């Protein structure tokens, strides 16, 4: 291949799991001489790593593919490849409707797409990743796939069954990330709760966490914890180890028992409340994030009000809500999508309005406190960062005005919180790293 034909623009859409897949692809390709460009206009090949989880994500993936086709038709690029979740669901349809695309590849076809761009998969590089910015924070994907059967979700169809990554392999990957300057390690999977059961016959999340903590990352954060049978020893470890963030992402989806049964979540409202109480008792400093779904098939106004009351009572520190999306490859697609779209959106907004008030109150209590902040970016003379209670991209930010020239991205500083809004903190830097 010529140098020009080795220039590739990779657009990664969707979740952090997709980001990791893209970073693995980039590391393998770069080892073969492929150069990744900042924009499509500088490349000869475009790769789109798609998301197919909900309708909006599918639409974005299709729109970006159509935009790439326009680039190809204009002669600015020669080849287009589409990979990831969307081809897992609709490969034959995509091949028919988008013949301009030169190849479609699923979530488990890394060697094939490397071949398509003139590279070769090298097993000795399977832990290597080319990190996307910012380089001080990254994700460690501890498993592939999912073996839960939540009715609203098509991930098992897209990603296959749950497969834990060996512990020693994860430690080697974490070391490679650390050597690249990563200081905040975010543990991710479709379900971190089950980690190790398939490989070792028992839950190994706590074992992994202890080993990672010994590696002296500044922050280690837990995301995507399934509530059923969550190992509470993890919370004890969290309270004992200073570099494990007092934070847990625990998607509950709903609280009504009928809906939880229909969702096939394997847990009841009573079980959810007992778990939350146990977590908070073991670690009073923890911040809990959850995700809810509004407008699930058959959800009555009374059942939704039960969800509102649940959120008001539990007072989650962070909460996101999605309007139910009727996905054709999910088990719930067999149910009638009975809640009108307008009502779904209204319920979502109502729950988020409730959470906004809770977030405002909780942030207000931080005013006057001195808190460690991780700096993510600098805009003019303002440094933007997060506390240990805020995950990248989805949670609160902290703006430190006037600190842009005194501190760099990736630094951890001590800041005083001077003001707040529902989803933002405003502070002053008190101490910068030496």
UniProtKB/Swiss-Prot annotation:
Reaction catalysis annotation: L-aspartate(89)-[ribosomal protein uS12]-hydrogen + (sulfur carrier)-SH + AH2 + 2 S-adenosyl-L-methionine = 3-methylsulfanyl-L-aspartate(89)-[ribosomal protein uS12]-hydrogen + (sulfur carrier)-H + 5'-deoxyadenosine + L-methionine + A + S-adenosyl-L-homocysteine + 2 H(+)
Domain (MTTase N-terminal): residue spans on this chain: 6-122
Organism: Chlorobium phaeovibrioides (strain DSM 265 / 1930) (Prosthecochloris vibrioformis (strain DSM 265))
Record bears the keyword Disulfide bond: no
Radical SAM core domain segment(s): 132-361
Binding site for [4Fe-4S] cluster 1: 15, 51, 85
Keyword 4Fe-4S recorded: yes
The entry's keywords: 4Fe-4S, Cytoplasm, Iron, Iron-sulfur, Metal-binding, S-adenosyl-L-methionine, Transferase
GO MF term set: 4 iron, 4 sulfur cluster binding; aspartic acid methylthiotransferase activity; metal ion binding; protein methylthiotransferase activity
GO biological process, one term: tRNA modification
Enzyme class of the recorded protein, top EC level: transferase
Name listed for the protein in its UniProt record: Ribosomal protein uS12 methylthiotransferase RimO
Coiled coil: none
UniProt binding sites for [4Fe-4S] cluster 2: 146, 150, 153
GO cellular component: cytosol
Cofactor(s), by name: [4Fe-4S] cluster
Domain (TRAM) ranges: 364-431
PANTHER family: RIBOSOMAL PROTEIN S12 METHYLTHIOTRANSFERASE RIMO, RIBOSOMAL PROTEIN US12 METHYLTHIOTRANSFERASE RIMO
EC number annotated for this UniProt entry: 2.8.4.4
Protein task: Catalyzes the methylthiolation of an aspartic acid residue of ribosomal protein uS12.
UniProt remark on cofactor binding: Binds 2 [4Fe-4S] clusters. One cluster is coordinated with 3 cysteines and an exchangeable S-adenosyl-L-methionine.
Signal peptide positions on this chain: none
């Amino acid at each position: 291949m010529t140098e020009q034909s080795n220039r590739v623009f990779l657009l990664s859409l969707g979740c952090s799991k997709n980001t990791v897949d893209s970073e693995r692809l980039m590391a393998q390709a770069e080892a073969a001489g492929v150069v990744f460009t900042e924009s499509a206009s500088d490349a000869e090949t475009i790769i789109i790593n798609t998301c197919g989880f909900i309708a909006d994500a599918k639409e974005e993936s299709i729109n970006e593919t159509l935009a790439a086709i326009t680039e190809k038709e204009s002669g600015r690029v020669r080849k287009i490849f589409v990979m990831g979740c969307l081809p897992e669901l609709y490969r034959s349809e995509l091949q028919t409707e988008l013949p301009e695309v030169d190849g479609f590849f699923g979530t488990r076809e890394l060697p094939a797409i490397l071949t398509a761009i003139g590279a070769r998969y090298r097993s000795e590089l399977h832990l290597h990743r080319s990190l996307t910015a910012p380089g001080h924070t990254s994700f460690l994907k501890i498993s592939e796939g999912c073996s839960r059967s939540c009715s609203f979700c098509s991930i098992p169809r897209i990603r296959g069954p749950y497969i834990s990554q060996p512990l020693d392999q994860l430690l080697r990957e974490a070391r490679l990330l650390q050597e690249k300057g990563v200081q905040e390690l975010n543990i991710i999977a479709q379900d971190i709760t089950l980690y190790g059961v398939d490989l070792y016959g028992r839950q190994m999340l706590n074992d992994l966490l202890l080993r990672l903590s010994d590696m002296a990352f500044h922050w280690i954060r837990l995301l995507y914890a399934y509530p059923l049978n969550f190992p509470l020893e993890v919370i004890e470890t969290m309270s004992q180890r200073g570099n494990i963030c007092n934070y847990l992402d625990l998607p509950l989806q709903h609280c009504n028992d009928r809906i939880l049964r229909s969702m096939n979540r394997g847990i009841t409202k009573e079980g959810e409340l007992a778990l939350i109480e146990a977590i908070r008792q073991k670690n009073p400093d923890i911040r809990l994030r959850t995700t809810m779904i509004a407008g699930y098939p058959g959800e009555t106004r009374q059942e939704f009000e039960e969800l509102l009351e649940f959120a008001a009572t539990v007072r989650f520190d962070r909460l996101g809500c999605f309007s139910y999306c009727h996905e054709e490859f999910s088990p719930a697609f067999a149910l009638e999508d009975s809640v009108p779209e307008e009502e779904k959106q209204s319920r979502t907004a109502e729950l988020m309005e409730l959470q906004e008030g809770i977030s405002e109150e909780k942030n207000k209590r931080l005013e006057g406190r001195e808190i460690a902040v991780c700096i993510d970016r600098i805009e003019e003379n303002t440094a933007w960062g997060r506390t240990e209670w805020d995950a990248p991209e989805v949670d609160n930010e902290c703006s430190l005005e006037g600190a842009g020239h005194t501190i760099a991205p990736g630094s951890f500083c001590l800041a005083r919180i001077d003001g707040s809004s529902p989803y933002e903190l405003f502070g002053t830097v008190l101490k910068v790293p030496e």
